A protein has these predicted regions:
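The feature encodes the CheY-like receiver
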Residues: 18, 60, 88, 106
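Acidic catalytic/metal-coordinating carboxylates
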Residues: 36-37, 63-66
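Two-component/phosphorelay signaling modules centered on CheY-like receiver
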Residues: 15-33, 98, 120
Length: 125
């Protein structure tokens, strides 16, 4: 039986954030793909769904809320952890209503991030 590493997709328009998350997650054995645009992520999900999506809310093309809505409309079941540096009242509740499993604030706490991803990976196993 071939073991595959869990695939984590990162959607963030900040290149430094994508690079830092990619480096961190790879050290923990995850396969990582990064996207700077929501449209790119949605196109990629049509061919391969990630085990977990780290989703920034504020994006230049399609915001995180719209990404969640489109994933749901396309019946693409992806476990999502929202990451944002722009917390607003009601955001956490809104993203959870759209299907996100967790909501984390930037700057990210490595322990909290890994716990959120670990919970998703364990549940899927």
């Amino acid at each position: 039986m071939i073991q595959t590493r869990p695939l984590i997709a990162v959607l963030d328009d900040e290149p430094q954030m994508c690079k830092a998350l990619g480096r961190l997650l790879k050290t923990y054995g995850f396969e990582v793909v990064t996207f700077a645009l929501g449209a790119e992520l949605l196109a990629a999900c049509a061919s391969r769904l990630p085990n977990c999506l780290l989703l920034d809310l504020h994006m230049p093309d399609i915001n995180g809320f719209e990404v969640l809505e489109r994933l749901g409309a396309q019946n693409l079941r992806v476990s999502v952890v929202v990451i944002t540096g722009h917390d607003q009242p009601g955001n956490a509740e809104r993203v959870r209503a759209l299907g996100a499993l967790d909501y984390l604030l930037k700057p990210l706490n490595e322990t909290q991030l890994l716990a959120a991803i670990g919970k998703i990976i364990q549940t899927a196993a």
